[in-house]
């Protein structure tokens, strides 16, 4: 986990002309998650809601391009910082990130009133593993994965082939296994020029 690489905020959706509602979501285990809800647009019904789970380094203020893209496509969006990232409380952990994702889902379906059939779950890099876990336990309209990995042990073994990473890894984020439990349509986006994942 690299939540401390840049916990500072660069900007908000307002800096790119988007209206937003700041969020402070409380997880079942008492952490507070910082986030934003960006409505689809003035007077326009949303085509649905995209819940965005970002990658490892940085925070929600570094993902304004996703908020703009989904807004321009007619979707509302909800983005959170996992525990230990950005302004969220707590300490980063695999299990904690799954609880955080479920907290965002609960807010989307209960407080914002979106039915599951109108929610797209989007995950980038580390967020892809978080999004996959959520989609395996809930039934979103779709799961979109961008530049993600099959599992942390697989990624580690590719980067360090001479080390027994698969045996030593405590953090798993096993998306390959969880994808078999996802019943929603899945779109995987990846670049051949991505030299990290």
Feature locations, PLM:
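An N-terminal hydrophobic leader/cap segment in hydrolases
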Residues: 1-24
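Membrane-embedded segments
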Residues: 26-111, 117, 135
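Glycine-rich nucleophile elbow surrounding the catalytic serine of serine-hydrolase chemistry
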Residues: 122-133, 196
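Alpha/beta-hydrolase fold nucleophile elbow
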Residues: 113-125
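Short glycine-enriched nucleophile-adjacent loop
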Residues: 53, 128-143
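Active-site nucleophile loop of the alpha/beta-hydrolase fold
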Residues: 140, 144-154, 171-175
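Short beta-strand/loop motif that positions the catalytic acidic residue
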Residues: 181-183, 187-194
